[in-house]
Regions:
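Beta-propeller fold recognition
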Residues: 1-6, 34-442
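Extracellular/luminal ectodomains and secreted, surface-exposed scaffolds of diverse proteins
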Residues: 8-9, 14-27
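A generic structural motif
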Residues: 29-33
């Protein structure tokens, strides 16, 4: 309930702000809402109800403004620490750069305004230097985006120390629950050139940029009415050996509902994908009067096993549709120019609450080609699966070490002498991987 309707509040109906068309009254301590249209509610849960929510953020005293974490959700992700230029654009004096932590807003538990942000925090004092709001897309009849946004995933932080770029500070990439990838400028760059898709080169025209600038780089176009492609886990990043492009790799899956209970299974259409950032190592900018790129700008490599459908220079990237309501259950891992995805296949019927099956999908980083057959041969009931079967249950993040891949599994592994650990040989194709730098992960 809203305890004090004299204070600011926001009312949402099915993800749409209806505050201006709703009247709230408080009679004897009981708050009543009067809408301008009828909404459905079934207390038995036998039929679908409309989703009505009220958000009211508590007031902040003047003494606590520098520690304003009111919009922080459940912090599932890990902060990243680096040195940021304290004067922003044009600050070439690295001696007075400041240590900051980049923390995503966390899981908002589907509460509007909570967790859909990124905090830049003074590492020494804990004060909030900047709260960067990330858009929670409004519902429209085309995209049908009805997911309440937040950012449970860890950020991707790229410093010049971990790459061949020429700037101080970092370029930050965050992917949110509704599948947008946002690029944030925390460098000393003063301007950025534009990338020409026709020539594959940067133009001589430059656009001024400032510290804390951001724009949406990509959008997977998530909707519970169409595909149920939630993005809970972080991306991985690296330079493709053949393309020489900077890539971001991700996967979708509703880990809060692994077996898709009370969900139309025909509307569960998860994906694995790789996206190029054409502007790297510069910041780039949003397209004027255009929507962010989506999978329409990418090659569908779902059935490609020989590289014949490799993305061209002007394609944004590649994507693979995952069948049988499978879902990516942890962040992908790059090693040896191959990206590895931990995948879960839910059981159906009488065992719909069971463990499900675990697979590792291996994909060529540059082309999106399915390389899973190189991991081993599936036998018996798994012989027709396109990814490599490794046991029952949910996989952890896959770790590459030497020539091996390691992962924990919640059920039973196919490794006979290691019940809850998966150990298999990796595929070696060579990759420059930025996630292994101590400067980025410290």
């Amino acid at each position: 309930n809203i305890l004090d309707i004299s204070k600011d509040y926001t009312i949402f109906a099915n993800g749409i702000d209806v505050t201006s068309s709703t009247t709230a009254t408080n009679i004897s301590g009981e708050v009543k809402l009067i809408f301008n249209k009828e909404y459905r509610y079934d207390a038995t849960g036998n039929t679908s109800s409309d989703n009505i929510s009220i958000v009211q953020i508590g007031e902040l005293s003047s003494g606590g403004e520098e520690y304003d974490y009111r919009y922080l959700g459940e912090t599932w992700g890990s902060p990243r620490v680096f040195r940021m230029p304290n004067e922003g654009a044009g600050d070439n004096n690295v001696l007075d750069d400041e240590y900051v932590a980049i923390l995503t807003g966390g899981f908002g538990n589907f509460s509007h305004s909570i967790g859909s942000n990124v905090y830049v925090i003074d590492w020494l004092t804990g004060k909030v230097k900047k709260e960067i709001k990330i858009e929670d897309k409004a519902y429209d009849d085309n995209s049908k985006n009805d997911i309440i946004n937040s950012i449970p995933a860890s950020p991707i932080v790229i410093t010049a120390d971990s790459s061949q770029a020429n700037f101080s500070g970092a370029l930050v990439y965050v992917n949110d629950l509704e599948g947008k990838i946002t690029k944030i400028n925390l460098t000393n760059m003063e301007q950025t050139p534009e990338y020409d898709l026709l020539t594959g080169k940067f133009t001589t025209n430059a656009t001024p940029i400032n510290l804390y600038d951001k724009y949406t780089l990509f959008d997977v176009m998530a909707s519970t009415q169409i595909n149920n492609i939630y993005s809970y886990h972080s991306l991985d990043a690296g330079i493709g050996v053949r393309s020489k492009s900077f890539w971001l790799f991700g996967g979708t899956g509703d880990i809060m509902n692994l077996n898709d209970l009370q969900v139309d299974h025909n509307k569960v259409k998860n994906v694995m994908y790789g996206i190029k950032d054409f502007s790297y190592p510069f910041f780039g900018s949003a397209k004027t009067n255009q929507s962010p790129d989506n999978f329409l700008r990418c090659k569908n490599t779902t059935k490609d096993q020989d590289g014949s459908n490799c993305p061209d220079i002007g394609d944004r990237g590649w994507y693979i549709n995952i069948d049988d309501q499978k879902k990516v259950v942890n962040e992908p891992t790059l090693t040896g120019n191959v990206v590895y995805y931990p995948v879960f296949k839910p059981l159906r019927g009488s065992k719909s609450c069971g463990d499900g099956k675990a697979y590792i999908c291996s994909v060529d980083a540059d082309c999106g080609t399915n390389l899973s057959k190189k991991l081993g041969t599936n036998e018996g009931a798994e012989s027709n699966e396109e990814c490599y079967y490794v046991g029952s249950g949910v996989l952890s993040k896959i770790v590459g070490f030497g020539t091996k891949l390691y992962a924990n599994i919640s059920g039973e592994s196919t490794n006979k002498d290691k019940d809850d650990i998966v150990v298999i040989d990796a595929i070696d194709n060579g990759l420059i991987n930025y996630r292994t730098s101590w400067r980025e992960n410290y």
